[in-house]
């Protein structure tokens, strides 16, 4: 199910990742200032729904946004209803 409030704890609706300074639903590990729902790992300023590695495409694995996509990584970006 969705991984809200998971892992080490960042800011946001359900951030997961250590010290994600982003806001939105489910910031990833090391997210610095991304906004949107579900930023991914180490994406600086990535915005959108469920961003992956730190870009903004449309529903990509790494670096795409599109809420509800799946990413089998603990730090790899979880969106609106992603699966681990």
From Swiss-Prot:
Matching InterPro entries: KRTAP_type8/19/20/21/22, KRTAP_type_19
Pfam families: KRTAP
Tissues/organs with expression: Strong expression in narrowly defined pattern restricted to the lower and middle cortical regions of the hair shaft in both developing and cycling hair. During hair follicle regression (catagen), expression levels decrease until expression is no longer detectable in follicles at resting stage (telogen).
Keywords: Keratin, Repeat
GO CC annotation terms, alphabetical: cytosol; intermediate filament
Region (24 X 2 AA repeats of G-[YCGS]): 9-78
Induction notes from the record: Expression in skin and hair follicle is regulated by HOXC13 and by GATA3.
Family: Belongs to the KRTAP type 19 family.
PANTHER family: KERATIN-ASSOCIATED PROTEIN 19-3-RELATED, KERATIN-ASSOCIATED PROTEIN 19-4-RELATED
Function summary: In the hair cortex, hair keratin intermediate filaments are embedded in an interfilamentous matrix, consisting of hair keratin-associated proteins (KRTAP), which are essential for the formation of a rigid and resistant hair shaft through their extensive disulfide bond cross-linking with abundant cysteine residues of hair keratins. The matrix proteins include the high-sulfur and high-glycine-tyrosine keratins.
Subunit details: Interacts with hair keratins.
Name listed for the protein in its UniProt record: Keratin-associated protein 19-4
């Amino acid at each position: 199910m969705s991984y809200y409030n998971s892992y080490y704890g960042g800011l946001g609706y359900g951030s997961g990742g250590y010290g994600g300074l982003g806001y939105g639903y489910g910031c990833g590990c090391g997210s610095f200032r991304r906004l949107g729902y579900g930023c991914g790992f180490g994406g600086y300023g990535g915005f959108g729904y469920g961003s992956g590695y730190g870009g903004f495409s449309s529903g990509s694995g790494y670096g795409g946004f599109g809420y509800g996509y799946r990413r089998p990584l603990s730090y790899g970006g979880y969106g609106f209803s992603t699966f681990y």
